[in-house]
Amino acid sequence: MSITAERKAEVIQGNANKAGDTGSPEVQVAILSERIANLTAHFKTHTKDNHSRRGLLKLVSTRRSLLDYVKKKDEARYKALLEKHNIRR
């Protein structure tokens, strides 16, 4: 499940470090978290949708890789990201 362009713009604006920032790890993690939340809601009604479940696992893995990168570069930013998006570690 994808997110709408309007919702994606809101997520980017809420997490951007500066104007026009769409590629920072914070923004990427925020977008992935939004997509993961949408898929999680989808699975509440479609429990046997294993093809989408594989996509969810790929999204979680990508987010995990980005979080590992942020943790390696700056632990304070990493902890702030976990807290802001309610991500369990």
Curated annotation (Swiss-Prot):
Keywords: Ribonucleoprotein, Ribosomal protein, RNA-binding, rRNA-binding
Compositionally skewed regions (Basic and acidic residues) per UniProt: 1-10
RNA-binding is among the record's keywords: yes
InterPro entries tied to this protein: Ribosomal_uS15, Ribosomal_uS15_bac-type, uS15_NS1_RNA-bd_sf
Region annotated Disordered, chain positions: 1-24
GO cellular component: cytosolic small ribosomal subunit
Keyword set includes Transmembrane helix: no
CDD domains, per the entry: Ribosomal_S15p_S13e
Biological process according to GO: translation
Recorded GO MF terms: rRNA binding; structural constituent of ribosome
Family affiliation: Belongs to the universal ribosomal protein uS15 family.
Quaternary structure note: Part of the 30S ribosomal subunit. Forms a bridge to the 50S subunit in the 70S ribosome, contacting the 23S rRNA.
The protein's role, per its UniProt record: One of the primary rRNA binding proteins, it binds directly to 16S rRNA where it helps nucleate assembly of the platform of the 30S subunit by binding and bridging several RNA helices of the 16S rRNA.
Protein known as: Small ribosomal subunit protein uS15
Organism expressing this protein natively: Rhodopseudomonas palustris (strain HaA2)
UniProt lineage: Bacteria, Pseudomonadati, Pseudomonadota, Alphaproteobacteria, Hyphomicrobiales
